[in-house]
Swiss-Prot record:
Annotated Gene3D superfamilies: 2.30.42.10, Ribonuclease Inhibitor
PTM sites of type Phosphoserine: 37, 583, 694, 750, 821, 861, 925, 1126, 1206, 1209, 1212, 1218, 1262, 1265, 1284, 1320, 1359, 1389, 1455, 1458, 1485, 1496, 1518, 1551, 1557, 1571, 1601
Interaction with ARHGEF7, as annotated region: 703-1215
UniProt keyword annotation of Ribonucleoprotein present: no
Source species: Mus musculus
Protein name stated in the entry: Protein scribble homolog
Length: 1665
């Protein structure tokens, strides 16, 4: 609709205005401006009260909407709307329609509904154009007699009026299609109603019709007929003439049968005949072939017609609440049936043909008498099968059985057979007060009503409750009934007693009672006990208040529903006390003294064992006297009965505390939620008052509590980085922490926090903090006061202290066998209880514990008690809920999680409140004596419903010291296993977990084939690595670190990991674990680190499963360790995480068994809060040689990690990944060692140049701090060092011989972590080539093992001596790197900026030291007898000469040549030098043999060739290092001219960016006997002649191994920007002297391999100088 906004000079030709829902109170003025053009005006849903006269000038209106207004008068001017077609004035206050309405001749649609009209004007029938007229709810009492003049009417709505008759002229409305007469007072319909030929819908519901005229059968076009809610007793047979009828609604009438003609309604689709009096359904119903919905609810049908099977289109059949006794087998013909509801009938069996209804999805047979279901129903695809009224789940689990009567296979479940429920006609017949309790009202209610029952059986307490209208609801008790409870508590103190039963019931009455109670039990297993005459009966508790609809559905709920509330179950049968005090059901019950004929109702709950005390144990005579007087009081008087309630074990304050409002337990240390206070509606025995003692209803001795005194303390806490270590609760306006006190209380104290060390305890009331009073403060004020208190917090607290009563009775701790049996009265007027031994089926044993309070407290937590969440469902006792590791309770070893606390320091705790127990435990007493009750192996209590929470989680056997005498500790285990288990140093326990279908809540690690680190490092096994906080294992008392010895008797000490998992997952009703309480890993603790917004965590990790070991001291350890802590991250700021710690869990996610990548991903996904469980890992002091700077573990490329996965074994958690992601990193790592896949037998391969980026190498640690694990390459396979890198610590600068690098097949000793001793000469490699390769100064290649016996012969063609100068010059040219066209890829930062700065500082310092040292050595090493060769020798050569040269002989096993003496000042670089050296050796040690004499001439020539090659290589290296030094001088000079040098550019670079080499890393491919290729480093070409003449300078060591170069190769990612701009920049690295562990089998030189060198020559020829 167009809404016109009147603007200046706007177009006023507006045809439609919509002002609905505009809250208009008057008609807008602008509407009048459009009087010439406006045709549609909608003013509905406003607040118009009148229509002004200008309104009726809108003469062109065709549609007017005025509904939902407050118009009180329709003016006669409405006649002006001559062109009006549609008028809607519904839902106004118009009392009458003006007579002038007749002039609106064009009116076709009129709606006057919802107005207080009482009549229509006489001229109304002149509106002959009217087609749709609505007069609903207008209080019409009669229609105009000439209503037939409205000949064009199509729709006439007259619902909700006061019509009692219809005019005969109604039949003239020949165009009428819809007539609605519902909700009137019609009693008779005119016969002329059948003369409406076009009528399609006729609504006659909610009238007073008692019959329908037969003429209705003439309405041939009628589609819908609704005559529901009338008084029809029968239908006319002519109704079958309605050939087009589809909907026939006959609900709520008095029909007793359906006419036979109903079968003629071939188009009938919906037939509703519910709430009638049908006794049968005609067989003609089967002819309604299109019938899809048939509703026959609430009739008197006893059977269904057999023709029902013809209804092939029937989808919904509802026959609820009838008297059906059998279902016709023909129902299987309803193939389209999807919903079949047969609820509340009398069906005893279902026909198997029902399975033919293939589309059946919902079957409701609740409230019948079915014994079983036909097995054929399994063929149906049922979505819901309802067997009971309150069935919790739509589908159940069925079992197959054989029918005892027919022998056929049937389906059954726990809801079958069904219990019959009374029919509805019995609902009004209430039982009289004298009838049995089984005749309870039948209507199901949501509460248990305490109503009139047998007077002789009704307690006074229950009578009082009934008079007050008390309704007992499901536990927990609603808070709104607390006030009502106080009234009952007052009546308890008046010692109401029960009236004795005047006469015992007859056996027939007993049978009725038992049968009624059996019906109430709803599916429980019947007991075999029978009632015997003359013996007192104990009837089920509170049956009076339980309707018969209540118990069975409740049982169904608890069995099927996933969540089960704590329930109270009722005893099904009478419990007959026997002589030994045990009931027929096998549960120990007290044989209480019941008067003759007295019948008691016992509430059967979770079995509890009576805490009786023996008379012999009472230490004081007044306690004995009080006990005897209490018994006499019970027996006094002719009507003395047995009292029914528990005695409150507290002094006068007990009632006040029980009547307190529901309070919320805010003690976070116990971790228990809130619940309402437990309630027992039983009377209290009025025992005489004896100071110090009292009694409960069974005359059990109860010790009164100690007196509570309050003291004020002033404590000072020094705040630390982690806070104060306390939590507070309460405050003004908050939920009180204790009672009604709105003060601030300490709710939690961290065990090792500053507050605990200062003496703060849980329960202290906070009065003042640093002078700020907190008595009436709100919670947030207290929080702000604590936060702003500064470093030293001085607080004033109020603490409660227990003072023992004057005549307190102290109880001797009971031994486990001193459990108490029920008492019986024998002899005369007063009989003492007979003490009998406990029955052998006892599930519990008692033991005493005495704990000495430490500075950290007692070390355990309690849960349960009144006023707190029950630790176990339905059990209000106090239990040990947690034992702190290392606390007093843990060290004592006498407490276990789940132990019930019976008394604390002699004060009974069986019915105590939670806060009382806390007060006793936090008292000032240094020692605490506990009497505990522990569940032991044996029969279990009645199993709770599945998934009930929480349940008694396990039955934990006591340790040997507290076991029951004469009872085997672990009966399921073999004696050998038990003996072996008990021999260990740690306690062994058997823990049983009831399997209820849910998870165990634990994870294991270890096994004979898996590492179990950090558990059992020295003694591997299967360990519990994770326990879910509230899982089944945690409730059983299992802890992290427990060693599993056996699972259900199966020994798993030597089992594999998978076998242990299979044993734990094996289906069984109960899982019994034999565990040994091994101590947890040392240093295990949980740390919480908070990250600031945008702050990085700042740690790096190493290790992981299926990768490189993160523990350098143990290569088998697959744990995750912290390898670096950045001082700028959150971890460095926190200060508790340090290098070497092992990570066990991150945010409750275990890291055990995760790969390195998974651990990195998990750590990177944490939010702002990191909760990490750590323990001690490796000692960083033993791996100091691996560190390049403080707090940084050495780079894996330099730390002897020589594995392909070295790159993947250390990751920074805060590293920004490249766009390529981890896949790119893995690709780089996978390309690191391509030479491994090459054949070692390929010869003549060119060693292509290796391009090393200067920046990448300069960022690596210097050789002075470089640790290289010794490695030997054999046959193309890299072998690991025989010992850990940390075991090789020698002076920097000394090149270790090859003796430390052993192949795996060598006899070198391999000990874990042991020192690597130098080998003996016999253990040296036999191959001469291998020996020389170990010390060659040029990089060589390793021949395969099968070439050991083939010494190389010099090839003359390839000899460097035969090459020209220019050909030799090519070896010394540096290759110019051509920049790549494409842009550099994204760098991956491997070294942080702070680490790079530390490396550079350390490098500069070491270079300074080396320069000074070399200058000093140069003067010493120069001598006159050096000759020409010595002129070129440098201190580097002397260092090499100082090494013990081992020259092994041929494979024959000859001893190596003697090494030169240490400290010799003549390096062996020439033949003359060697002769001089040998002369000195002969002079010093004449007995040394000459190994060369044993060599053949060919071998001697080969050896000489090797020596010469070695010497030439040393000279070439000296020249090359001089050239490098010169280049550095040039770079320094350029730096003075404003250009930056490589070191400065490296320092400014954010991270070392390795440069990718265009050549594959096949430079180090293993070849049979290829010449050593020179490895040119990328840079610009420099002519050898340009720098060969430069003066010799201090050389730079560059001793590396091929695998080291290979690792460096993986660093290459992109050329550094500007790296090619500088003159003289070469890709070299200043590595200083090698580390002790850096045994380089070859040296990397600066030579270029431009051509193949023939095999057999190991070096270069002499270079002309």
């Amino acid at each position: 609709m167009l809404k016109c906004i009147p603007l200046w000079r706007c177009n006023r030709h507006v045809e439609s205005v919509d002002k609905r829902h505009c809250s208009l109170q008057v008609v807008p003025e602008e509407i009048y401006r459009y009087s010439r053009s406006l045709e549609e005006l909608l003013l509905d849903a406003n607040q118009l009260r009148e229509l002004p006269k200008p309104f009726f000038r809108l003469l062109n209106l065709r549609k007017l909407g005025l509904s939902d207004n407050e118009i009180q008068r329709l003016p006669p001017e409405v006649a002006n709307f001559m062109q009006l077609v549609e008028l809607d004035v519904s839902r106004n206050d118009i009392p009458e329609i003006p007579e002038s309405i007749k002039f609106c001749k064009a009116l076709e649609i009129a709606d006057f509904s919802g107005n207080p009209l009482s009549r229509l004007p006489d001229g109304f029938t002149q509106l002959r154009s009217l087609a749709h007229l609505a007069l609903n709810d207008v209080s019409l009492q009669a229609l105009p007699g000439d209503v037939g003049n409205l000949a064009n009417l199509v729709t006439l709505e007259l619902r909700e009026n006061l019509l009692k008759s219809l005019p005969a002229s109604l039949s003239f409305l020949v165009k009428l299609e819809q007539l609605d007469l519902g909700g009137n007072d019609l009693e008779v319909l005119p016969d002329t109603l059948g003369a409406l030929p076009n009528l399609r819908e006729l609504w006659l519901d909610r009238n007073q019709l008692s019959a329908l005229p037969p003429e209705l059968g003439n309405l041939r076009r009628l589609v819908c007929l609704d005559v529901s809610e009338n008084r029809l007793e029968e239908l006319p047979v002519e109704l079958g003439g309605l050939a087009l009828l589809t909907d026939l609604l006959l609900s709520q009438n008095l029909l007793q049968r359906l006419p036979e003609g109903i079968g003629q309604l071939k188009q009938l689709s919906i037939l509703k005949v519910d709430q009638n009096r049908l006794c049968e359904v005609t067989e003609a119903i089967g002819d309604c072939e299109n019938l899809s919905e048939l509703i026959l609810t609430e009739n008197l049908l006893t059977a269904l017609p057999h023709s029902l099977g013809k209804l092939t289109k029937l989808t919904n059949l509802n026959v609820d609440r009838n008297h059906l006794e059998v279902l016709p087998p023909e129902i299987g013909g309803c193939v389209a049936l999807s919903v079949l509801s047969l609820r509340d009938n009398r069906l005893a069996v279902l026909p198997p043909e029902l399975a033919h209804t293939a589309e059946l999805h919902v079957l409701d047979v609740a409230g019948n008498r079915l014994r079983s279901l036909p097995f054929a129903l399994t063929h149906l695809n049922l979505k819901a099968l309802w067997l009971a009224e309150n069935q919790a789940q739509p589908m159940l689990r069925f079992q197959t059985e054989d029918d005892a009567q027919t022998g056929e296979k049937v389906l059954t479940c726990y809801l079958l057979p069904q219990q019959p429920l009374p029919s509805l006609e019995d609902a009004g017949q209430q039982s009289s007060p004298s009838e049995s309790c089984s005749d309870a009202p039948l209507s199901r209610v949501s509460v248990i009503q305490f109503e009139d029952t047998l007077e002789g059986e009704e307690d006074a307490e229950e009578a009082a409750a009934e008079k007050r209208g008390l309704q007992r609801r499901a536990t927990p008790h609603p808070s709104e009934l607390k006030v009502m409870k106080r009234g009952i508590e007052e009546r308890r103190n008046e010692a109401f007693v029960c009236k004795p039963d005047p006469s015992p019931p007859s056996p027939s009455e007993e049978e009725k009672r038992l049968s009624a109670e059996s019906a109430l039990s709803g599916g429980s297993v019947p007991s075999a006990s029978t009632a015997s005459e003359g013996e007192p009966e104990i009837l089920p508790a509170e049956v009076q208040g339980l309707g018969q609809h209540e118990a069975m559905p409740a049982q169904e709920e608890y069995t099927e529903d996933d969540y089960n509330e704590p329930t109270v179950h009722f005893a099904e049968d009478t419990l007959i006390p026997r002589e030994d005090g045990e009931s027929e059901e096998g549960q120990p019950e007290a044989a209480w003294p019941l008067p003759s004929g007295r019948q008691r109702l016992i509430r059967k709950d979770t079995p509890h064992y009576k805490k009786h005390f023996k008379i012999s144990k009472l230490p004081q005579p007044e306690a004995v006297v009080a006990l005897l007087q209490g018994v006499q009081t019970d027996r006094e008087g002719p009507t003395a009965g047995w009292h029914n309630g528990p005695h409150t074990p507290w002094a006068p304050r007990a009632h006040e505390e029980e009547e307190e409002e529901e309070e919320e337990n805010r003690d976070e240390e116990e971790g228990e939620a809130t619940t309402e206070e437990d309630d027992k509606e039983e009377a209290v025995a009025s025992a005489p008052s004896v100071k110090g003692v009292s009694f409960d209803q069974a005359n059990n001795l109860l010790i009164e509590p100690a007196r509570i005194e309050e003291e004020e303390l002033t404590l000072t806490i020094v705040r630390q980085t982690g806070g104060l270590g306390i939590s507070i609760a309460g405050g003004k306006g908050s939920t009180p922490y204790k009672g009604d006190d709105e003060g601030i209380f300490i709710s939690r104290v961290s065990e090792e926090g500053p507050a605990a060390r200062a003496g703060v305890r849980v329960g202290d009331k906070l009065l003042e903090v640093n002078g700020v009073a907190l008595q009436d403060a709100e919670h947030h004020e207290a929080v702000e006061a604590l936060r702003g208190a500064g470093a030293a917090v001085q607080m004033r607290v109020w603490r409660e202290r227990m003072v023992e009563p004057e005549n307190a009775v102290t109880i001797t701790p009971l031994r486990p066998e001193d459990d108490y049996s029920p008492r019986e009265w024998r002899g005369g007027g007063l009989r003492l209880p007979l003490l009998q031994p406990e029955t052998p089926v006892s599930l519990r044993q008692r033991h005493a514990a005495c704990l000495v309070r430490s500075e950290k407290g007692l070390g355990f937590s309690i849960a349960g008690g009144k006023g707190s969440t029950p630790y176990r469902a339905g059990d209000g006792g106090i239990f040990i809920s947690r034992i702190a590791e290392g606390g007093a309770a843990h060290r004592a070893g006498t407490l276990q999680v789940g132990d019930r606390v019976l008394s604390i320091n002699g004060v009974d705790m069986t019915e105590a409140r939670h806060d009382h127990a806390v007060s006793l435990l936090t008292a000032a007493s240094p020692t605490i004596s506990l009497l505990l009750e522990r569940e032991t192996g044996g029969t279990y209590p009645p199993s709770p419903p599945p998934h009930s929470s929480p349940t008694p989680a396990a039955t934990v056997a006591a340790t040997v010291s507290t076991a029951v005498p004469g009872e085997p500790l672990l009966p399921r285990l073999s004696p050998s296993l038990l003996a072996t288990a008990l021999e260990g140093p740690y306690p062994v326990e058997e823990i049983c977990l009831p399997r209820a279908g849910g998870p165990l809540g634990l994870s294991i690690v270890g096994g004979s084939d898996h590492s179990s680190h950090p558990f059992g490092v020295q003694d591997p096994g299967v360990f519990i690595s994770k326990v879910l906080p509230r899982g089944l294992a945690a409730r059983c008392g299992l802890r992290v670190g427990d060693r599993i010895l056996a699972v259900n008797g199966q020994d798993v000490r030597e089992a594999t990991h998978q076998e242990a998992v299979s044993a734990l997952l094996r289906p069984c009703l109960e899982l019994c674990l034999l565990v040994r309480r091994d101590p947890p890993p040392p240093g295990m603790r949980e740390l919480c680190i908070q990250k600031a917004p945008g702050e990085k965590l700042g740690i790096s990790i190493r290790g992981g499963a299926k990768g490189h070991a993160g523990n350098p001291c143990d290569p088998t350890d697959e744990g995750i360790f912290i390898s670096k802590v950045s001082p700028t991250g959150a971890a460095g700021r926190d200060g508790r995480l340090r290098v070497g710690l092992r990570l066990l869990e991150v945010n409750q996610q275990s890291l055990l068994g995760l790969t390195h990548a998974e651990a990195v991903q998990l750590l990177r996904s944490v939010g702002d809060t990191l909760t990490v469980l750590v323990c001690d890992g490796f000692d960083t002091s033993t791996t100091t040689a691996l560190e390049v700077s403080p707090g940084v573990i050495a780079n894996p490329f330099a730390a002897g990690l020589g594995h392909r996965n070295s790159l993947e074994s250390i990751s920074s958690i805060d590293r920004e990944l490249s766009p390529e992601g981890p896949g790119k990193e893995k690709e780089l790592a996978s390309q690191a060692l391509p030479w491994e896949s090459e054949s070692a037998e390929t010869t003549g391969r060119n060693l292509e140049p290796l391009k090393l980026d200067y920046r990448a190498l300069a960022a690596l640690p210097s050789a002075g701090s470089l640790q290289r694990g010794p490695s030997a390459t054999t046959g193309g396979k890299t072998t690991e060092a025989p010992c850990s890198p940390g075991s090789q610590q020698t002076k920097p600068g000394v090149i270790q011989p090859l003796a430390q690098a052993w192949p795996r097949n060598s006899p070198a000793p391999r000990g874990r972590g042991g020192p690597c001793s130098p080998p003996s000469p016999d253990e040296l490699p036999a191959n001469v080539k291998q020996a020389y390769r170990a010390f060659a100064a040029v990089p060589t290649v390793h021949p395969p093992e099968n070439s050991a016996t083939q010494p190389p012969t010099p090839g003359p063609a390839a000899s460097p001596e035969q090459l020209s100068f220019r050909e030799r010059q090519k070896y010394f040219e540096l290759e110019v790197r051509v920049p790549q066209a494409e842009g550099p890829p994204k760098r991956v930062s491997l070294v942080g900026a702070d680490d790079l700065r530390k490396m550079q500082e350390e490098e500069a310092r070491k270079l300074q030291q080396k320069r000074a040292q070399m200058l000093r050595e140069e003067a010493v090493t120069s001598g006159p007898d050096m000759g020409l060769a010595s002129d070129r020798e440098s201190p580097d050569d002397q260092q090499e000469a100082e090494q013990p040269w081992a020259v092994p002989s041929h494979a024959g096993g000859s001893s190596p040549s003697s090494p030169p003496p240490l400290g010799g000042n003549a390096p062996v670089r020439t033949a003359k030098a060697e002769r001089r050296h040998q002369e000195r050796l002969r002079m010093q040690s004449p007995e040394l043999p000459a190994p060369e004499r044993a060599l053949s001439p060919a071998e001697r020539r080969a050896l000489e060739a090797e020596k010469r090659a070695l010497w030439r290589a040393a000279r070439m290296k000296s020249l090359e290092q001089d050239a490098l030094r010169a280049q550095m001088v040039l770079s320094k000079s350029q730096e003075g001219r404003g250009k930056r040098g490589p070191l400065e550019r490296l320092a400014e670079a954010p991270s070392p960016a390795p440069t990718p080499s265009p050549t594959p890393l096949e430079d180090f491919g293993l070849q049979t006997s290829a010449s050593p290729g020179r490895l040119p480093l990328s840079g610009k070409k420099f002519d050898y002649r340009a720098f060969a003449a430069l003066p010799s300078s201090r050389p730079v060591y560059d001793i590396q191994s091929p695998d080291f170069v290979e690792e460096l190769r993986t660093l290459e990612a992109s050329p550094s920007p500007g790296s090619q701009e500088e003159d003289g920049e070469v890709a070299l690295v200043l590595l200083g002297r090698p580390s002790p562990g850096a045994v380089g089998p070859e040296d990397m030189t600066l030579c270029s391999s431009r051509r193949s060198v023939r095999p057999g020559r190991r070096g270069l020829g002499p270079v002309p100088s």
